[in-house]
């Protein structure tokens, strides 16, 4: 199966899961509506009538027809979530490129949040008292604008906007793999209880903030709507005390905000639960005539670079497979092909993993070279060692020079030139052309002028450490892959009868150790740049743990696997330190 066909097959599998997530999102709307009606129509003295009346309302024809707009908005919300999960993650070096690539998608997603919040509030207000149900109501024999309805519709849109800003505006959608394996029913039950309980607390801030804003601008909005609809003004919520003293309205707004926040959180987590389930990947394809041609191999899943979720699932599957002791699936990695007696399974898997590790390390190294602190440390010239300088004085001068270069402090006296400038071979000093000097000065002046324009640097300059942050945020496949390789290498001592892994041990150790050295360099400046410390710590600990597992298993053979030098000494020190 080619790379494109593997990608399409994986996308088709994930698309089916996204469809099930949409159906779950639609079903949860009626469950949340039932919970809302149970709160609103609470009757302590008549519990049976309270429950039966609520269920009768949910099952009525009015509910089914009135919920059609909300269901349509939920489907739109789910389609956008599916598109974000299955799309390629591109690096945008500047904020302008980010706006071009992600801006339209974010605006559409914000519109979906506002639409779901508005339609949820519109549907729920239809079950409240007459003053809350419609935008217009009869007051003193005339049509008046309902300030209560305006308040609830506005708080629905505010809740949707609040969830988008706090969760989706600057962050990309990602899935999390559970540490403890649970069934889907157990995950759904825990998610439902936790979401409903958490939403009651998280809805306090948006409710209070919206109420404060409505006290200031609510009468103006109601006055404007009354002119548009040609109705009279509603004066029930005039002033601060008119809003604050209406306890029932505040309770409805708080409950509605909690319902909307829990609804959006549940829809997002449904995708995370279903998409984090294992893909049906195989180590080797069966060669029988009746074998399925659509079987996706583990190597093909790791090679799907344009869908981040697929690569994460393949790496996680490889990690779980490597942890299964004495399993037939893990034994397939060490098997030879028939006919031919070649380690085709291990060869393709090892080459794919080393290719991913090598490309990730190279990109990380290139991105770290753009960080000014690391660049200054690498380009710092070493002072000329003389006999009169002691070791402590040398160290003090190096630290002083690093400090001055970091903060841009120049020496008062220009340094003396101890080394004579080498003259050209022909003895003639060549000066640069005056046209070249003028053009260079004009270019530098133009750059300085453009940088003074407000917003130019912010939009069109690449932030320091942005590429490094992007790589670390998308390093989950590398985290699982390094640990899986370490487990397979450690298990090969007992389970590899043909020794197919031992030939590639030096390359695996060097690749992981190279990544470890780069992460150690980055750890020295992690506090000075905007890098997610959680993703960095996860990657660094996984790499160190993987390298330690391999070195501990082959500690007696490190001298045979690696040539003598600095790398061998580092690995021996790692085993001794741990």
Swiss-Prot record:
GO terms for molecular function: protein-macromolecule adaptor activity; structural constituent of nuclear pore. GO terms for cellular component: endomembrane system; nuclear membrane; nuclear pore; nuclear pore transmembrane ring. The modification Phosphoserine is found at residue 414. It is found in: Nucleus, Nuclear pore complex; Nucleus membrane. It is a multi-pass membrane protein. Keywords: Membrane, mRNA transport, Nuclear pore complex, Nucleus, Phosphoprotein, Protein transport, Translocation, Transmembrane, Transmembrane helix, Transport. The chain crosses the membrane at residues 22-42, 61-81, 107-127, 145-165, 201-221, 240-260. InterPro entries: Nucleoporin_prot_Ndc1/Nup. One of its GO terms (biological process) is nuclear pore complex assembly. Residues 1-21, 82-106, 166-200, 261-578 are cytoplasmic. Residues 43-60, 128-144, 222-239 are perinuclear space. Component of the nuclear pore complex (NPC), which plays a key role in de novo assembly and insertion of NPC in the nuclear envelope. Belongs to the NDC1 family. This is Nucleoporin Ndc1.
């Amino acid at each position: 199966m080619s790379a494109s066909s593997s990608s399409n097959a994986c996308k088709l599998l994930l698309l089916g899961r996204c469809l099930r997530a949409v159906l779950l999102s639609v079903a949860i709307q009626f469950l949340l509506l039932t919970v809302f009606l149970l709160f609103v129509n609470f009757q302590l003295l008549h519990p049976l009538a309270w429950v039966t009346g609520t269920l009768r309302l949910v099952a009525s024809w009015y509910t089914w027809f009135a919920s059609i707009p909300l269901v349509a908005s939920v489907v739109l919300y789910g389609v956008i979530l599916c598109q974000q999960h299955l799309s390629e993650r591109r690096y945008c070096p500047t904020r302008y490129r980010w706006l071009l690539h992600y801006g339209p998608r974010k605006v559409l997603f914000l519109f979906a949040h506002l639409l779901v919040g508005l339609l949820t509030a519109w549907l729920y207000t239809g079950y409240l008292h007459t003053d809350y149900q419609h935008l217009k109501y009869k007051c003193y024999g005339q049509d008046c604008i309902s300030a209560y309805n305006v308040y609830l519709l506005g708080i629905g849109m505010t809740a949707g906007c609040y969830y988008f800003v706090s969760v989706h505006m600057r962050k990309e959608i990602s899935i999390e793999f559970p540490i403890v394996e649970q069934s889907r029913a157990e995950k759904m039950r825990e998610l439902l209880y936790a979401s409903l309980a958490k939403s009651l607390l998280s809805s306090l801030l948006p409710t209070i903030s919206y109420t404060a804003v409505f006290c200031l601008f609510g009468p103006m909005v109601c006055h404007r709507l009354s002119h548009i609809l040609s109705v009279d003004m509603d004066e029930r919520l005039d002033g601060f005390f008119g809003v604050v003293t209406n306890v029932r309205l505040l309770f409805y707004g708080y409950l509605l905000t909690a319902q909307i926040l829990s609804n959006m959180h549940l829809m997002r987590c449904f995708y995370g639960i279903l998409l984090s389930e294992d893909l049906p990947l195989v180590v080797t394809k069966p060669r029988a005539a009746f074998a399925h041609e659509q079987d996706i191999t583990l190597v093909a899943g790791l090679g799907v670079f344009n869908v981040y979720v697929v690569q994460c699932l393949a790496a996680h599957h490889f990690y779980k497979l490597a942890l299964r002791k004495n399993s037939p699936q893990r034994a397939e990695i060490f098997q030879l092909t028939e006919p031919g007696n070649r380690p085709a399974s291990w060869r393709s898997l090892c080459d794919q993993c080393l290719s991913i590790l090598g490309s990730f390390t190279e990109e990380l190294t290139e991105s770290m070279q753009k960080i000014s602190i690391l660049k200054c440390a690498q380009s710092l010239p070493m002072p000329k060692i003389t006999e009169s300088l002691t070791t402590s004085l040398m160290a003090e001068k190096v630290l002083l020079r690093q400090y001055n270069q970091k903060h841009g402090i120049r020496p008062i006296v220009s340094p003396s030139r101890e080394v004579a400038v080498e003259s050209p071979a022909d003895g003639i000093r060549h000066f640069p052309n005056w046209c070249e000097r003028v053009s260079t000065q004009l270019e530098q002046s133009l750059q300085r002028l453009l940088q003074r324009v407000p917003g130019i640097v912010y939009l069109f300059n690449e932030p320091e450490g942005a590429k490094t942050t992007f790589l670390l945020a998308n390093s989950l496949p590398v985290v699982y892959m390094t640990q899986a390789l370490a487990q397979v290498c450690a298990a090969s001592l007992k389970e590899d009868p043909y020794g197919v892994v031992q030939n590639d041990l030096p390359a695996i150790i060097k690749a992981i150790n190279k990544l470890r050295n780069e992460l150690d360099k980055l750890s020295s400046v992690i506090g000075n740049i905007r890098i997610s410390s959680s993703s960095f710590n996860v990657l660094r600990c996984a790499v160190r743990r993987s390298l330690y597992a391999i070195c501990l298993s082959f500690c007696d053979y490190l001298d045979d696997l690696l040539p003598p030098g600095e790398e061998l000494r580092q690995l021996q020190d790692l085993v001794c330190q741990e």
